[in-house]
């Protein structure tokens, strides 16, 4: 490592038969070749299916990275339900499922539901048994064409909005208290509904 700041000059003091612990990677070019051959073998074996599955477009956590969009692990159960795909069928047609991820905004839900719908519009499912197609299987694929792409529905970054002058309304808007109030409103939704129901029952009892 190059010396770039002030400090003690590195001097490795070797002890304990250090030659035994030296690790070499002379097989790196061979491994690279075998990995490539394995990818080609897999692609030929599963053809005409795509090698990589479709992935959801997600935003990374933390304020540092959350303006970017990247590929996630799998689609949420809520996204699959909105797109009309069952959890069990999804994994059989190249749609990965991640039961842990949650949709925290309507935008993320709609974005990934749209991705699933576009994917399903281009998807051709061959029947397991020839001549016995099930619901959703393709019956006539004579006019179908195979499309070669680098990735299944590649993820593109969202357009960055130009900076705008801060308005008086934006200055007066209190984001923290607004979010806090909304969370409190959602938290007591059940209690509020129960109270209103009780009030309505009491009003009905008085009428009688």
Swiss-Prot record:
Family: Belongs to the eukaryotic ribosomal protein eL13 family.
Record keywords, A-Z: Cytoplasm, Phosphoprotein, Ribonucleoprotein, Ribosomal protein
Residues with PTM Phosphoserine: 177, 180
Superkingdom classification of source: Eukaryota
Protein name, as recorded: Large ribosomal subunit protein eL13
HAMAP family, per database record: Ribosomal_eL13
Pfam family, one: Ribosomal_L13e
UniProt GO molecular function: RNA binding; structural constituent of ribosome
Function: Component of the ribosome, a large ribonucleoprotein complex responsible for the synthesis of proteins in the cell. The small ribosomal subunit (SSU) binds messenger RNAs (mRNAs) and translates the encoded message by selecting cognate aminoacyl-transfer RNA (tRNA) molecules. The large subunit (LSU) contains the ribosomal catalytic site termed the peptidyl transferase center (PTC), which catalyzes the formation of peptide bonds, thereby polymerizing the amino acids delivered by tRNAs into a polypeptide chain.
Location of this chain's protein in the cell: Cytoplasm
GO cellular component terms given for this protein: cytosol; cytosolic large ribosomal subunit; preribosome
Oligomer and partners: Component of the large ribosomal subunit (LSU). Mature yeast ribosomes consist of a small (40S) and a large (60S) subunit. The 40S small subunit contains 1 molecule of ribosomal RNA (18S rRNA) and at least 33 different proteins. The large 60S subunit contains 3 rRNA molecules (25S, 5.8S and 5S rRNA) and at least 46 different proteins.
Originating species: Schizosaccharomyces pombe (strain 972 / ATCC 24843) (Fission yeast)
GO biological process, one term: cytoplasmic translation
């Amino acid at each position: 490592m190059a010396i770039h700041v002030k400090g003690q000059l590195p001097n490795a003091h070797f002890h304990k038969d250090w030659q035994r612990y030296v690790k070499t990677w002379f097989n790196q070019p061979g491994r690279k070749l075998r990995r490539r051959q394995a990818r080609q073998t897999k692609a030929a074996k599963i053809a005409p299916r795509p090698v990589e599955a479709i992935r959801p477009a997600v935003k990374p956590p933390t304020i540092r990275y959350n303006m970017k969009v990247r590929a996630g692990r799998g689609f949420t159960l809520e996204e699959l339900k909105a797109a009309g795909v069952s959890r069990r069928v999804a994994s059989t047609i190249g749609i990965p499922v991640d039961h842990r991820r949650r949709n925290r905004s309507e935008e993320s839900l709609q974005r990934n539901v749209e991705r699933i719908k576009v994917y399903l519009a281009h998807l051709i499912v061959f029947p397991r048994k020839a001549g016995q197609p099930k619901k959703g299987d393709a019956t006539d694929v004579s006019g179908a064409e195979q499309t070669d792409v680098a990735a299944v529905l590649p993820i593109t970054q969202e357009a960055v909005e130009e900076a705008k002058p801060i308005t008086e309304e934006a200055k007066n808007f209190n984001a923290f208290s607004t979010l806090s109030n909304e969370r409190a409103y959602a938290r007591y939704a059940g209690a509020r509904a129960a109270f209103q129901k009780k009030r309505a029952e009491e009003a009905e009892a008085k009428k009688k």
